[in-house]
């Protein structure tokens, strides 16, 4: 633990002590503009659809709070606080929103400066194509075929909001600003409760999106920080002491000699001491930790994560939130795809001169399919179908024009096909297409007060079919199944597009209203 404390001290060298004085400066909007924001561009407040604000309003509110009369009225009339008076929706919601947003902007400045200096020192090259979400799937296909086990980690754990404030003390040594942050966290009564799931945390973020997004990112940053520390400690590459390095070499030679004498036992225990090949991928509130080591090594890593996070985060980490599975016997839900690495048996016929024989070859394949149940549930929540997948009309859209209704349904269908184009099986997509097409027809029939059959005969199903199958031509990577005996080649083609920069709303159920 002393090594970790020394390792973490290096990361605290850029602590800032000027956040609170900077917050109450008159020209805070200038700092926000230099930070990369547009001071004149209004930012929409979630929960206040009719009100917008900019950093200039933040400056005016801070100047008004800095005046003596504002605080005198707050002291003389504590039950009628202009900022905390819930009876006045404008003061209780609008002022608290813009003040907390301004606080989040100022606190982000030292973190952005640190990231900027780090990127300038490392000179990290930027590739536009790697910004696509689909670019990670070819990486997983290339790496996961050689791995053996996988761990599913749920982030965040149940954590008190006070611990989130304590995380900022590593970077910001400013007591007034931390007290101001506690003021925002205590503004709503339910903010003092534990965060028990990613959904509840997202609901809190909807009240104050920028501030809680900053707190969540700081929490994940600290979590990945000690995870990186554990990974570096398990590797001999960063060792600088020659004596320790020689001891490691002698130990490896002894293990090699031991493996010659006891090959069976050595094969089971060697991966505990050797450096594993590990890959870490995080997606929203989940993380995937894949390794080439055995299941026993993954259990050791699980023990490290539980014990170390219990000491560092000062709370009990539930071991059941870290699931260990063999990669060939399990599947994982990642970014709207159900991915797995099954072992397929391929029968090959080999002929040499007059003799012919068959060879059975076992091969790993990275398979990605579209889960039907979550997507049908998302369509049901959006009122396109029932819970069992039966298409229904959408009465909310009956006031729109026919072209707007067709355009909305068609855009949803094209986005689904575009995002899930990497699926090796397209049957689920065709089922979703059928649900959306029939829901569109029933919506139009309800608008014109006719039956679906009459409306389809009058409009024609050919127009709807051409409308839904219209696809935009983009540069893509194609991975085509080269099997000569496939009668459904179009169902197995996998296409990864390089222009997808955001997750589909139906894939992420947290974004559905």
From Swiss-Prot:
Q: Which organism is it from?
A: Danthonia spicata (Poverty oatgrass)
Instruction: Give GO BP annotations, semicolon-separated.
Output: mRNA processing; RNA splicing; tRNA processing
Compartments, as annotated in UniProt: Plastid, Chloroplast
Instruction: Specify where it is mainly localized.
Output: plastid
Q: Does this UniProt record's set of keywords contain tRNA processing?
A: yes
According to the lineage, what is the superkingdom?
Eukaryota
Q: What function does the entry list?
A: Usually encoded in the trnK tRNA gene intron. Probably assists in splicing its own and other chloroplast group II introns.
Q: Does the keyword tRNA processing apply?
A: yes
A Gene Ontology cellular component where this protein is annotated is: chloroplast
Family membership noted in the UniProt record:
Belongs to the intron maturase 2 family. MatK subfamily.
* Top-level taxonomy: Eukaryota, Viridiplantae, Streptophyta, Embryophyta, Tracheophyta
**Protein's name according to its UniProt entry:** Maturase K
For molecular function, the Gene Ontology terms on record are: RNA binding
Keywords recorded for this protein, A-Z: Chloroplast, mRNA processing, Plastid, RNA-binding, tRNA processing
């Amino acid at each position: 633990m002393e090594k970790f404390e020394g390792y973490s001290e290096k990361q605290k060298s850029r602590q800032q002590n000027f956040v609170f004085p900077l917050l109450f400066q008159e020209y805070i909007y200038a700092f926000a503009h230099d930070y990369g924001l547009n001071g004149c561009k209004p930012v929409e407040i979630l929960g206040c659809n009719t009100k917008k604000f900019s950093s200039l309003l933040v400056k005016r509110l801070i100047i008004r709070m800095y005046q003596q009369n504002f605080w005198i009225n707050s002291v003389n009339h504590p039950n009628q606080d202009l900022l905390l008076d819930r009876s006045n929706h404008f003061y209780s919601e609008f002022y608290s929103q813009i003040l907390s947003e301004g606080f989040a902007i100022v606190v982000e400045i030292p973190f952005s400066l640190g990231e900027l200096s780090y990127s300038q020192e490392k000179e990290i090259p930027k590739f536009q194509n790697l910004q696509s979400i689909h670019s990670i799937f070819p990486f997983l296909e290339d790496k996961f075929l050689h791995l053996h086990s996988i761990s599913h980690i749920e982030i965040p754990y149940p954590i008190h909001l006070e611990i989130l404030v304590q995380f900022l003390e590593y970077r910001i040594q400013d007591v007034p600003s931390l007290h101001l942050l506690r003021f925002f966290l205590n503004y709503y009564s339910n903010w003092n409760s534990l965060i028990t799931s990613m959904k509840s945390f997202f609901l809190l973020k909807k009240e104050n999106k920028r501030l809680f997004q900053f707190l969540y990112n700081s929490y994940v940053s600290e979590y990945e920080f000690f995870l990186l520390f554990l990974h570096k400690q398990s590797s001999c590459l960063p060792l600088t002491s020659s004596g320790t390095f020689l001891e490691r070499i002698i130990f490896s030679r002894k293990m090699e000699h031991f493996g010659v004498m006891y090959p069976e036992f050595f094969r089971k225990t060697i991966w505990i001491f050797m450096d594993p090949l590990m890959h870490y991928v995080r997606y929203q509130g989940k993380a995937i930790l894949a390794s080439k080591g055995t299941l026993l090594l993954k259990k050791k890593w699980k023990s490290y994560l539980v014990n170390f996070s219990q000491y560092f985060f000062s709370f009990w980490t539930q071991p059941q939130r870290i699931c260990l599975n063999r990669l060939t016997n399990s599947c994982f839900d990642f970014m709207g795809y159900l991915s797995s690495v099954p072992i397929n048996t391929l029968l090959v016929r080999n002929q040499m001169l007059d003799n012919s024989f068959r060879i059975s070859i076992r091969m790993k394949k990275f398979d990605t399919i579209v889960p039907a149940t979550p997507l049908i549930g998302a369509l049901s929540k959006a009122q396109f179908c029932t819970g069992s997948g039966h298409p229904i009309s959408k009465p909310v859209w009956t006031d729109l024009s026919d072209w707007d209704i067709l355009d909305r349904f068609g855009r949803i269908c094209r986005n689904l096909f575009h995002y899930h184009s990497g699926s090796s099986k397209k049957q689920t997509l065709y089922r979703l297409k059928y649900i959306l097409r029939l829901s569109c027809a029933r919506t139009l029939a309800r608008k014109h007060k006719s039956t679906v059959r009459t409306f389809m005969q009058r409009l024609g199903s050919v127009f709807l079919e051409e409308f839904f199958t219209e696809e935009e031509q983009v540069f893509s990577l194609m991975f085509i199944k080269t099997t000569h005996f496939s009668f459904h080649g179009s169902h197995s083609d996998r296409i990864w597009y390089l222009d997808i920069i955001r997750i589909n709303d139906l894939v992420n159920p947290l974004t559905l209203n």
